[in-house]
Amino acid sequence: MKIAILSRNKRLYSTRRLVEAGEAAGHEMHVIDTLRCYMSMVAHKPEIHYKGEVLEGFDAVIPRIGASITQYGTAVVRQFEMMGVFPVNESVAISRSRDKLRSLQLLSRKGVGLPITGFAHSPDDIPDLINMVRGAPLVIKMLEGTQGIGVVLAETRKAAESVIEAFMGLNVSVMVQEYIKEAGGADIRCFVVGGKVIAAMKRQAAPGEFRSNLHRGGSASLIRITPEERATAVRAARIMGLNVAGVDILRSHHGPVVMEVNSSPGLEGIETATNKDVAGLLIKFIEKDARPYRTQTKGSKG
């Protein structure tokens, strides 16, 4: 098979591992810089050009799109879809999962366990917003933040009011969530591929830190997840429409709660912690499921 990996840096661990795994399985792997792709939209002949050449003959595309280029990146994935190339994750699913608020709204509607979450626009509603999530301590998150950036733990009500008001004053959209103290600064990253959890790790926050992101000094270790946690991760990925997802779960007194569903989960932490060939399993999923893509848009035949 001829497989494209959309990545801005071919030296990144995840990109290198996918190339290695694909080539080991006998596939032709191409790392393509997302931002160097440009598109031609002509009746019945959508094209992607890359560094002066037309991209042709690809069977599948693996999107590794950073949050800062979501709009352009999903447009490129969508163009591959229009060309009939199988996307590991569809463009609409990537867009859906990147919108934190939309993700939680969809998961909430389907009954997936979540931390109590509030969202408001007016500073006048801050007091009730805090009450909504059972008061302080609480977590304040920028909707555009990634890797733990833009996440604040407010220990007191007064601190929460000040931080939320400051964000609102800067026209920064934030959501407020209950603080799951019993999680002890740890979360579980479940790596879902093709409707199955193929690997899971526990991420523990560094001392004095409540964010467990590995980019913020957290540590990772192998963990045995419960059947309920496994089912929750699979369901969350399915609701987002993602074939490949990193589902972040906290253990709370009222069962597993989903914090985030990541459409471009990194491989280094999970492979190191679990000693599993996650990249190889992702390639096997492509071998099994890749087929000419047909758009799902109503009224469209192709």
From Swiss-Prot:
Give the keywords, sorted: ATP-binding, Ligase, Magnesium, Manganese, Metal-binding, Nucleotide-binding, Protein biosynthesis
Which Pfam families does the annotation name? RimK, Rimk_N
Sorted alphabetically, the Gene Ontology cellular component annotations on this record are: cytoplasm
Cofactor(s) listed in the protein's UniProt record: Mg(2+); Mn(2+)
Q: Which GO terms describe its molecular function?
A: ATP binding; metal ion binding; ribosomal S6-glutamic acid ligase activity
InterPro entries, alphabetized = ATP-grasp (IPR011761), ATP-grasp_RimK-type (IPR013651), ATP_grasp_subdomain_1 (IPR013815), RimK (IPR023533), Rimk_N (IPR041107), Rp_bS6_RimK/Lys_biosynth_LsyX (IPR004666)
Q: State the Gene Ontology BP annotations.
A: protein modification process; SOS response; translation
Q: What is its EC number?
A: 6.3.2.-
Q: How is the cofactor bound?
A: Binds 2 magnesium or manganese ions per subunit.
Which residues are listed for Mg(2+) 1 binding in this entry? 248, 260
Chain residues that bind Mn(2+) 2: 260, 262
Q: Which SUPFAM superfamilies match?
A: Glutathione synthetase ATP-binding domain-like
Q: Where does Mn(2+) 1 bind?
A: 248, 260
Q: Per UniProt, where does Mg(2+) 2 bind? A: 260, 262
**Its domain of life?**
Bacteria
Where, in this chain's numbering, is ATP bound?
141, 178-179, 187, 211-213
Q: Which residues form the ATP-grasp domain?
A: 104-287
The UniProt family comment states:
Belongs to the RimK family.
- Protein name (database record): Probable alpha-L-glutamate ligase
Q: Which organism is it from?
A: Alcanivorax borkumensis (strain ATCC 700651 / DSM 11573 / NCIMB 13689 / SK2)
Q: Which gene encodes it?
A: rimK
